[in-house]
Amino acid sequence: IPETLRQTGVPGAVVSVVSGPSLVFADGYGLADVEGGVAFHPSRSLVRIGSITKLFTWTAVMQQVETGRLDLDADVNQYLPDFQIPATYPQPVTLRHLMNHTAGFEDFSIGTQVADAADLPPLGEYLAAHLPARIRPPGQVSAYSNYGAALAGYIVSVVTGEPYDVYIRRHLLEPLAMAHSTAAEPVPVSLRDDLARSYDTETLPPQPIPFTFVPQAPDGSLSATATDMANFMIAHLNEGRFGDASILEPATVARMHARSFAAHPGLDGYAHGFKELTVNGRRTLMHDGGWEGFRSGLVLVPGCGLGLFLSFNGSTGGIAGYEILLKFLDRFAPAPATPEASESRPESTLTPAEPLAGFYHSTRQNESTIEKLVTLLGSLSLSVAADGTVRFRGQHWTPQPDGLYHSSDSRERLAFLVGPDGRRYVVTDRTAYELLPSSETLPVNLAVLLVIVLPALATAARPVGWAIRRLRGRPARSTTAGWRIARGLGVGAAVGALLFLGRLLVVLLGDTSEFSYGV
């Protein structure tokens, strides 16, 4: 970790390791607050764990499944008193879909951050006002959804009558003795002085990032210490127990840790909100989280009772943290002497397909707002060589006897699949991608831009030619008043088009994070 901090310029990091029912290691590295000169401390420094908060949300859902208040396979609309998920498809959205990120919601970023606590809306109001479009049938393919997790947390609040942060404190943080952690925003005064600062380490020198509020709280509002996170890991590795407390029944923990979705049986999938990650032939359960400069990861190895939590307070810590996680597993969770039993194989609506070249985009996409520009201009090219080798995401993937493709540059696997509606997908262990229709591919969109730009440039150049002729003393071409008006309107439209395209480039190539606060 110290070497990683030097290489990345990240100010600090914190880590905790558990084995069975015990915390076996915890430490802090570097600075939690550069300006204040405050060192990272594993049991005092709070970090914002981002999407790892979802694991607390999913655990809360399973608690309410135990009580009988929630059913993973029921239409979520029966739990929503103030708004409803539209019946875009015959199949309703369920809590299981939310946990598997297969609800079929489009993704959005605009309005997902709030700069001032006074502007934080009630969770239910926010979810009703920001209801995303349903763009594919539920249960078909995963598309990571922050909205889905927030919706699940809201449902827990509805059926229990407790605000999300209060529920998490009473039913998870307090039983797990996580006294130095909170899901509340703003962070309580008693903990505020111990909150680590995060930094944009892609700039020199690194710049501190202001505290930003999460309107979708169940998606990412938790702030926690490394040792408190160790208690959460211990409970999940020990059938829901931590000391004398229990947050889940053993059978519920086993159910939660079982695979609940995989697009292909040979790929990693989801386990009721946990992400599967196969390393050295071992199945691990993990989740990562990134929020405003913090980069965190949590991984459990049920087969050997091992858990790791790691967090950096710099924006360049994500990839380095993942590499440390893999090295940790290589060292402390090597390949088992006998292969682990394979996970159950939930039925998938996708079937294997032949490789198909073209342009693909992540299933985590937007279809109905201006954010679709990211999809249109952010597609990835996939090619298939004569020997069957696939080139995708800058990597070579070689076909295997089991129908999967293995990457030569990483530990990932890939499969080509087709849905019942004919949509074509490329699915890896981490992400699913959908084949774009030709009308939405990058070359076509660039061609459309050229069709707009070239005439605009030609029209806008006419006043330049007129000015040059005047400077050279050449007589102006005689034109009618109508022609002069039309020419003026054409030039104005051309200049407007060029200004729009210029602004578009600034937006796409510049810092787009401000859009998270809304437009």
What are these regions (language model features)?
Residues 1-47, 69-71, 78, 86, ...:
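Short, conserved catalytic-motif segment at the N-terminal edge
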Residues 15, 21, 48-73, 149-157, ...:
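Active-site SXXK
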Residues 28-33, 87-302, 328:
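Short, surface-exposed loop or secondary-structure junction motifs
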Residues 47-50, 142-144:
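Catalytic tyrosine of NAD(P)H-dependent dehydrogenase/reductases that use a Tyr as the general acid/base
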Residues 275-279, 299-303, 383-387, 416-419:
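Short beta-strand micro-motifs enriched in acidic
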Residues 286, 297-314, 424-428:
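Short, well-ordered beta-strand elements
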